[in-house]
């Protein structure tokens, strides 16, 4: 049986004990592979992705235990975490009071009472996608059924930047979507459509002005930044306060 070496810890691995990566390097399943969350796709990852994710989990688990977990049972409504349970894997916890959210995987010990929680922690402001998705699967009886998911996508994130939360159906997804839309101040209702349209049109005009300036050579960095910021605010909401809250905490956890 062919033997290889774990690119992280140097352990000798074979086709059974090793995990092949997209760049044809290997990591050991027993130690290094277990440091990754189940939602992380190791097959399509290269070594840099894996090491970034392992560091992400180490840092995230520490922040979860020290900052967010104590808020899970808080009696203060302003501090209490919002939880989106996921029957297909880790749960998503959102903490507007800290500007952070966490994807938490619970691992249970076999034959021993107890469990451990491992987490990736993100700035809420970096959440740039929460889209509805369905998947046709066959159940244990061989009958086809539909699974419903919310696909979560984070910007400016190394390691695990996207994962799926299984929801009970489209109504449950709509509730999740409304929660984040409200949190970000994104208006999607018919009553606010005119106001929202005006904001987006102003953003587009700012971008158009930037394009015109680029064409005649008069575009400066300040104007370009304002144009990009205008589109972001109109489409994704103003996240300035969430960024400030999150960065104040993350400064204590360099990584």
Predicted feature locations:
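N-terminal cysteine/histidine-rich coordination modules
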Residues: 1-61
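Hydrophobic beta-strand residues in large extracellular and virion-surface proteins
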Residues: 6-9, 28, 92-94, 101, ...
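Short, aromatic- and cysteine-enriched interfacial helices/patches
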Residues: 16, 110-113, 184, 235-236
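Secondary-structure transition/turn motif
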Residues: 31, 104-109, 155-158
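Anionic N-terminal interaction surfaces
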Residues: 41-109
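Glycine-centered tight beta-turn/hairpin loop motif at sheet-sheet or coil-to-beta transitions
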Residues: 85-89, 115-117, 156-160
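Phosphoinositide-binding peripheral membrane targeting modules
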Residues: 100-143
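Acidic, Ser/Thr- and proline-rich intrinsically disordered linker/docking segments
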Residues: 130-255
């Amino acid at each position: 049986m062919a033997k290889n070496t774990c690119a992280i810890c140097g352990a000798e691995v074979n086709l059974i004990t090793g995990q092949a990566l997209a760049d044809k390097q290997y990591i050991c399943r027993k130690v290094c592979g277990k440091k990754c969350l189940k939602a992380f796709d190791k097959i399509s990852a290269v070594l840099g992705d894996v090491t970034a994710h392992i560091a992400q989990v180490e840092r995230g688990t520490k922040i979860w235990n020290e900052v967010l977990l104590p808020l899970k049972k808080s009696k203060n409504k302003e501090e209490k975490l919002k939880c989106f349970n996921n029957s297909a894997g880790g749960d998503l916890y959102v903490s507007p009071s800290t500007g952070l959210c966490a994807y938490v995987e619970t691992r249970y010990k076999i034959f021993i009472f107890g469990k451990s929680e491992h987490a990736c922690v993100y700035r809420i402001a970096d959440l740039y996608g929460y889209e509805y998705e369905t998947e046709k699967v066959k159940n244990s009886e061989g009958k086809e059924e539909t699974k419903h998911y919310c696909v979560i996508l984070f910007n400016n994130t190394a390691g695990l930047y996207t994962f799926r939360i299984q929801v009970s159906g489209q109504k449950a997804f709509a509730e999740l979507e409304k929660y984040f839309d409200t949190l970000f101040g994104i208006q999607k209702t018919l009553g606010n459509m005119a106001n929202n349209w005006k904001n987006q049109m102003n953003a587009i005009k700012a971008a158009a002005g930037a394009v015109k300036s680029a064409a005649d050579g008069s575009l400066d960095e300040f104007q370009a930044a304002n144009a990009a910021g205008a589109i972001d605010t109109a489409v994704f909401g103003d996240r300035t306060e969430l960024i400030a809250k999150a960065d104040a905490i993350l400064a204590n956890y360099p990584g």
